[in-house]
Amino acid sequence: KSLDDIKVDEVYSTSTPRGRIFDRNYNLLVDNVGVKTIYYKRKPETSTKTQIELAYKMADKIDLDYSKLAKTNLKEFYLVNNKDKVNKKITEKERELLKQRKITISDINNLKMERITDEELSNYDEKDKKAAYIYYLMNKGYYYDEKIIKTYASNEEFAYVSEHVKELNGFNVKLEWERKYLYGDTFKTILGSVSTNESGIPFELKDKYLSEGYSLNDRVGVSYLEYQYESLLKGDKATYLLNDDNSYTVIKDGIRGNDIVLTIDINLQKEVEQILTEEIVNAKMNNANTTYYNGSHVIITDPKTGEILAMASKQVVVNNGEYKVYDNTPALLTNPVTPGSIVKGASMSVGYKTGVIDIGTKMLDECVKIRNTPAKCSWTKGLGYLDDVKALAYSSNAYQYKTAMKVAGANYYYNGPLTVPESAFETYRKVFLEYGLGEKTNIDLPVESYGYKGTSYESGHLLDMAIGQYDTYTPVQIASYISTLAANGNKYKLHLLKEVHEKTNNEKMGKVVRNIEPELIGTVDLEQKYKDRIKLGFESVMKSLGYGYMGTVPSPAGKTGTAESFYDSDGDGKIDVPTISKGFIGYAPSYDPKFAITVLSPNVRYSTTSEYTSPVNSKISSRVSNKVFEILK
């Protein structure tokens, strides 16, 4: 028989294990483990009577949890076992209506099902119910598909089916696979998930995968990296010819999918997640004013390549005095934050680029008051006259307000009216975009949001924008910003894939077929002398407000941030509680950055009576920085 002569129902394909996933140091993160599986594939000539007999035979031989057997399934089993009896439940009038096509055969079947009584079903014992469940599994989905009857079969069950394939008429065994996570829950959310044999292609992804040649019962990546790199990770199916004696002839061998190597350092990732868990719980248990604080975010990058070395977010839920920590890493991609003063490096760039400030420009740090609005001040009072570097070192809001008014060409006097053109907002946003703030990073994950772009052009909002109190950005955008600043204005695309290896069935990895090179996606259009000035400001921060934020890492540079934020306290979709959020961005060593760090702690303070703010953000940042330096060294 040539392949062209073989009927479709004589050929079938089996799922092949997916490619493995490794970290940057070739530590195996995700592997496949063999699972003994019993399945059923109906032959065209098999009658319903034979199927029922097979179901009872298998009920005697395999241990199967049938608790998922629905009442409808049991009624269907009763119907096929008692056709004559159930047929009598249909009246002559109903049969006449069917002949007249006033009702359908489907309506008749529904009437039959409705009229099967609980008393009739009560005659079924445990074995009957088990057989009913097996019969249901045998007939679930399309008749020509393989139906999984049992996974994780015992050695005895596996051997029995294997030895009695001929008489079991459609039942067979195979070694299926499941994903095995060698580091437990560490980074597991972002590694993603794969559909099961039972679920096959999820409904919402059906059109996409069917258009790519998949079958409905194929196992596919359904989230994050498993979904993003489905085309690489999926294996090539083995194809078999079903012989008359129920044996198989191999037409084409299957092969495991491509192994992929990630940019993540799993040992660093593990440490970051542990530090987050410890510090978040400690803050909730022991720090005042943390009513609405429930977690923090961390991202570590290599600024010269865009490689993500670690990324984690944890969320704590307090229930009856018990602290339960959950993974919240997707929030790094989808939950915008109010950044606060960490944007001031980008804000200084606007001032330099437009020529309204220069190296050494001094301004008095004082409250700014626009008519009919509250005074806007720096967090620290009495800073006096500051130049551009000290304005960053001491996080002067007034310096940014006055710079913004100059950018807008506005005439300001205390408590007077202030008018600014819409173009001033766009001047800021254009420069912020060069750093990656306000645009998707296009990181290689399937979900990402933009953040919020304010729609009002009131003059006070321009001043807010200059200190990070207007537009909001996702944590990955903020990571892109500090990475760009650390890389001297070169913006590299953030990414998680490092290498792709050739498909193989061996334990040993195949040769590298693709190396992911750093992708330069933009540059900050600013003279080098001004870039150097901002870097000097960031270095000065670490000797003042940011002291200790990067632990004992040598030659750090960074920027602290405090933001006025809001929280939805009752889950009604409206933000109703004013809070304070904390942020820190940095890199080290400043003269040759090996890593950049982003740490964000939204809603870290809430109080109407106390100014106390939990040090959780600085504690996380300090511990993580030390750990990064220790591991990278």
Please identify what each model-predicted range represents.
Residues K49-D60, A159, E163, K188, ...:
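Solvent-exposed, polar/charged alpha-helical surfaces in well-ordered, non-transmembrane soluble domains
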